[in-house]
Amino acid sequence: AWQLKSAEFSAEEPKEAGFLLANMGAFALYDLRIAGFSAQEITNAFLLNKQIIGSLEILKNAGFSAKDLSEVTKPDETEKLYTLQNLIKAGFSAQELKYAGFSAKELKDANAEFSAQILKDAGFSAQELKEVGFSAQELINAGFSVKVLELINRLSNDKKLYLNKH
């Protein structure tokens, strides 16, 4: 890999030529990501080489998203390698985690620091936040209007009436 890098090959060229990722350790993770290697491929190569990635933060800093990393499985493909807690510790924001597919409930349950305000800013609705247990006052403090909360209550009551009749 050092010979490739010192010969001024980009990470894309050895990839196109069919070089194995496990033999491209001289390239920065960022270069490997730009070359088109997935988070799964990079993680598998490090695991196969018995190398330890210092932390998930390295992959994050290489430009992999929470979504990319949340989809990485263990080599036997039976379960996810990186948990929501791992992604939070690596510094991913509530918005990045929402984009990765995590629900408001999962985020609230995983981290007491994810307030109604933070989850609202991440793009969750007042209804979603109410359903996971935030109080009306917390929702108002997060910037939702009283009218929005009244509408949620009205819709909730209408739904209950409908379900009771059918």
Q: PLM ranges: what are they?
A:
Residues 1-4, 9-14, 19, 24, ...:
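Fold-core signature of tandem repeat domains
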Residues 46, 73:
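Active-site catalytic pocket residues across diverse enzymes, especially alpha/beta-hydrolases
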Residues 54-56, 159:
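Short amphipathic alpha-helical segments at helix boundaries and their inter-helical linkers
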Residues 74-76, 108:
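Extended non-catalytic scaffold regions that mediate assembly and binding
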Residues 151-166:
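A detector of long low-complexity, disordered segments enriched in serine/threonine/proline
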